[in-house]
């Protein structure tokens, strides 16, 4: 079995929106020998292991402290990536996280309404549609496990069901909850973590580790 890596996604809320923290585990599992391709079968398993919704009104320094505590979990030490929504108020929080010296590689993301990814001054610019569709593909293709017993697991499923795409008069797509008063913080925290896993590991390894497949049930325990 290869080393497991962890991806912590943080969607930062404002006065009327929750902040959400998601912890994703990427496990590389070795299966049986395949004589046809002359390689060991490998399985990449993505599992949502942690999901937290920070109470409304929590000051950003306290949010940073909470994120730091999560990243300093012994299981994550030296093998995690922290993907943070740096859109809007997120930049000052990213600066606080940098000064806090988390145990993770920090990847700030600015969520855009565009169509192409890019990077500028250390900030990744990622279309909202890429985050949402990427998560939907994983769920529909059984590529993401959601651990049973997560308090906010059912809320995540509800948020995904509430997501809609709206086409503006200019022909641009907008993704979000289809009615007011519905939150989407859990969806984006998980989507950021999943995006991070795909960004850091975009391709299957070559050579003797080239034979991969995804495994996982869409939901565990719900």
Model-derived features with residue positions:
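RNase H-like, metal-dependent nuclease domains and their acidic two-metal-ion catalytic environment used
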Residues: 1-110, 117, 125, 129, ...
């Amino acid at each position: 079995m290869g080393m497991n890596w962890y991806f912590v996604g943080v969607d930062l809320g404002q006065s009327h929106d929750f902040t959400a923290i998601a912890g994703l585990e990427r496990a590389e599992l070795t299966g049986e020998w395949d004589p046809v391709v002359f390689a060991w079968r490998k399985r990449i398993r993505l599992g949502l292991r942690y999901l937290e919704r920070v109470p409304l009104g929590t000051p950003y320094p306290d949010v940073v402290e909470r994120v730091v505590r999560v990243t300093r979990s012994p299981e994550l030490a030296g093998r995690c990536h922290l993907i943070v929504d740096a859109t809007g108020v997120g930049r000052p929080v990213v600066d606080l996280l940098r000064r806090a010296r988390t145990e993770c590689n920090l990847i700030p993301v600015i969520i855009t309404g565009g169509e192409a990814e890019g990077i500028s001054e250390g900030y990744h610019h990622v279309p909202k549609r890429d985050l949402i569709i990427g998560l939907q593909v994983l769920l529909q293709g059984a590529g993401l496990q959601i651990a049973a017993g997560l308090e906010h697991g059912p809320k995540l499923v509800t948020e995904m069901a509430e997501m809609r795409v709206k086409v503006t008069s200019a022909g641009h797509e907008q993704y979000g909850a289809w009615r007011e008063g519905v939150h989407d913080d859990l969806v984006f925290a998980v989507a950021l973590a999943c995006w991070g896993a795909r960004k850091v590991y975009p391709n299957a390894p070559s050579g003797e580790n080239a034979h991969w497949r995804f495994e996982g049930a869409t939901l565990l325990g719900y």
